[in-house]
Curated annotation (Swiss-Prot):
Protein's recorded name: S-adenosylmethionine:tRNA ribosyltransferase-isomerase
A Gene Ontology term for the protein's cellular component: cytoplasm
SUPFAM superfamilies recorded: QueA-like
Biological or metabolic pathway of the protein: tRNA modification; tRNA-queuosine biosynthesis
Pfam family, one: Queuosine_synth
Keyword RNA-binding attributed: no
EC number assigned by the record: 2.4.99.17
Annotated organism of origin: Escherichia coli O45:K1 (strain S88 / ExPEC)
Homology family: Belongs to the QueA family.
Subunit structure as annotated in this protein's UniProt entry: Monomer.
Chief subcellular location: cytoplasm
A GO MF label: S-adenosylmethionine:tRNA ribosyltransferase-isomerase activity
Protein's UniProt keywords contain Cytoplasm: yes
Compartment(s) of residence: Cytoplasm
Length: 356
């Protein structure tokens, strides 16, 4: 399969740079997986699409202010993007500089360069950085860090992004990017879903900066997926198994919830799904056998990205590309702050040939 098979034309004007004034007021394009039929509506229509007893699985990660500016003590400017917090004092990060710092290099971080840190080791493209400060990493990031808006949102971060670029149920700090499908859920909608009898469960996947890395190979099968930490606790496993036993659907809110659930299913030895607390490098593309997820809430993804491949594996390649073509024609808003899709599983997707 070629990466270019997942390309589509997207006018710049359709990339959303700000969210809607109300979280749940965005548009919703529904794609019926088996037939490919499309329905246009608004996000609150989700209430009519879910049945009592269906299970919504959310990702409760919280975005950290992971972008830091500063300079090397020797003079050159640097930009640091935290990939993950290793412990109370150390981070693993991407560093942009005219010349990469060497182990032992002193870094002065923050807009006022008030935080002292040391680059202690290099691991491939990532740098290990230790803060020389009494405060925890999270406290330091909260005081000097910027919200790491995706590269296609072409503006500086604003104070409002600290809340707007978080889901209302975010709980566990650690992500470099928001699980954006969840941004559309506000408290009134969640309350209505609960009142209808829709069940809810929460996984954790700390989205890494790798989510924005382009696929740099021509053939999909050659791509090496970035690694992210995921948690699927026992209560989620119980909720999934109970929903399946009732004949209800498991609906993943966002591709990160999909990747968490399907990672836990892949690693399970005795049951459909078992608890999972580990790094995952799961790469879902056409031909993948879904085991857990029956429906998906997701935003519109970048051309040639691993996420449009994941959706194609779920709904079918042809149905997905047709839906994206319709979304462009109907001027849906794309990417992190954009509109959403509701997709049901296409069991024939696994047999579909792509790019032939």
């Amino acid at each position: 399969m070629r990466v270019t098979d997942f390309s589509f034309e997207l006018p710049e004007s359709l990339i959303a740079h700000y969210p809607m004034p109300e979280r749940s007021s965005c548009r919703l394009l529904s794609l019926d997986g088996p037939t490919g039929a499309l329905t246009h509506g608004t996000f609150t229509d989700l209430l009519d699409k879910l049945n009592p007893g269906d299970l919504l699985v959310f990702n409760n990660t919280r975005v950290i202010p992971a972008r830091l500016f500063g300079r090397k003590a020797s003079g050159g400017k640097i930009e640091v993007l935290v990939e993950r917090m290793l412990d109370e004092k150390r981070i693993l990060a991407h560093i942009r500089a005219s010349k990469a710092p060497k182990p032992g290099a002193e870094l002065l971080l923050g807009d006022d360069e008030s935080i002292n840190a040391t680059m202690t080791a290099r691991h491939g493209a990532l740098f290990e950085v230790e803060f020389n400060d009494d405060r925890s990493v999270l406290d330091i990031l909260n005081s000097i860090g910027h919200i790491p808006l995706p590269p296609y949102i072409d503006r500086p971060d604003e104070d409002a992004d600290r809340e707007l670029y978080q889901t209302v149920y975010s709980e566990k700090p650690g992500a470099v990017a928001a699980p954006t499908a969840g941004l559309h859920f506000d408290e009134p909608l969640l309350e209505k879903l609960r009142a209808k009898g829709v069940e809810m469960a929460f996984v954790t996947l700390h989205v890494g900066a790798g989510t924005f890395q382009p696929v740099r190979v021509d053939t999909i099968e050659d791509h090496i997926m970035h690694s992210e930490y995921a948690e699927v606790p026992q209560d989620v496993v119980d909720a999934v198994l109970a929903a399946k036993a009732r004949g209800n659907r498991v609906i993943a809110v966002g591709t990160t919830s999909v990747r968490s659930l399907e990672s836990a299913a892949q690693a399970a030895k005795n049951d459909l799904i078992e608890p999972f607390f580990d790094d995952t490098q799961i790469f879902i593309y056409p031909g993948f056998q879904y085991k857990v997820v029956d429906a998906l809430v997701t935003n519109f993804h970048l051309p040639e990205s691993t996420l449009i491949m994941l959706v194609s594996a779920f709904a079918g390649y042809q149905h997905t590309m047709n839906a994206y073509k319709a979304a462009v024609e109907e001027k849906y808003r794309f990417f992190s702050y954009g509109d959403a899709m509701f997709i049901t599983y296409n069991p024939q997707a696994i047999n579909e040939r792509v790019g032939e």
